[in-house]
Design a protein with these regions (language model features):
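Domain-level signal for soluble alpha/beta catalytic cores
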Residues: 1-297
């Protein structure tokens, strides 16, 4: 596997800043496309090549709002997801398109998003486990080869969900940062299997994660998890909750954004020791701007 195009300088800068600052990450891409661009029947990854100017515009809005870290529009851009969504271009093309779209916004730092693959597996020597690991390796290499500063395996609901994905990402990483982000319940434990967050942190770090965090959970869940993660982690902690489930209307899903609540919460997360804060589904650049103002960015 050729790693000569990996962005080593960007990786070093990401590691340095995660260790010394509280960075502000962008908000979501998928829910913005869904709510503002009437994209209910269009997979987000499709936009990377078909409507790159739209993806870049959303990234630019986040940068203008104060985001220091952008996240590629590749949450569902593995070969498995592209086949499911009937997207013809290759994994390399779609992921490079997403990286190029994000780079058009001139971010300070750029993470490559990798979401759940959706294949069940039962044993580490099974064909299914090897398939997931290979799919993750392929997407990780595509993102790194396109120039991201690090990988972000996000919306992880269980250790079982994480195992082959982290292994595959590490196969491709060759020393590049791999960040892991879990979904937790309101007690701060993993949503999918109920494992306590301390054990999840231990597993992720033991198997090579360079950062641990939570995303796509409620504010209450994030508030419960962050102090526990900071206390148990030896790597930087990240936090990016959502605003809850949308209300279904005739015009599609509507989220009730609460920028003030996120602005207040991000101060608490910084005080608790979080290295990167942001927001997930249902928020927009309005929330990012409120957080940037609260953090004096």
């Amino acid at each position: 596997m050729d790693t000569s195009y990996y962005n080593r300088f960007g990786a070093e800068e990401l590691a340095r800043r995660l260790s010394n600052e509280t960075l502000l990450a962008q908000g979501p891409m998928g829910s913005v496309l869904l709510s503002e661009y009437d994209a209910a029947d269009i997979p987000p990854a499709f936009w990377n090549l078909a409507e790159p100017q739209t993806v870049s515009r959303i990234h630019r809005l986040y940068v203008a709002a104060g985001a220091q870290v952008l996240i590629t529009n590749t949450f569902q851009a593995s070969s498995y997801a592209l086949k499911h969504d009937q997207i013809a271009p290759s994994v390399a093309e779609v992921n490079r398109g997403a990286v190029d779209d994000a780079r058009q916004a001139h971010p300070q730092l750029l993470l490559g998003s990798m979401g759940p693959i959706g294949i069940e597996w039962f044993a580490e020597d099974s064909a299914e486990y090897r398939e997931i690991r290979g799919i993750a390796r392929e997407q990780a290499h595509a993102l790194l080869n396109a120039g991201v500063d690090g990988l972000l395996i996000e919306t992880v609901t269980s250790i079982r969900n994480l195992q082959p994905m982290l292994a595959g990402a590490r196969d491709a990483a060759d020393g590049m940062p791999v960040l892991v982000s879990f979904v937790v319940d309101d007690k701060g434990d993993l949503l999918g299997d109920g494992l306590n967050i301390e054990a999840a942190v231990l597993y992720a770090e033991k198997h090579g994660a360079n950062s641990v965090g939570v995303n796509c959970c409620s504010l209450a869940a994030a508030n419960a998890a962050v102090p526990r993660m900071v206390a148990s982690a030896t790597t930087p902690v990240t936090v990016r909750p959502n605003v809850g489930d949308p209300v279904q209307t005739q015009d599609g899903p509507v989220w009730h954004e609460n920028p003030e609540a996120f602005a207040r919460a991000c101060i608490e997360w910084r005080h608790a020791g979080a290295a990167m804060v942001g927001s997930c589904c249902g928020t927009t650049a309005i929330t990012t701007a409120a957080m940037a103002e609260a953090l004096d960015i």
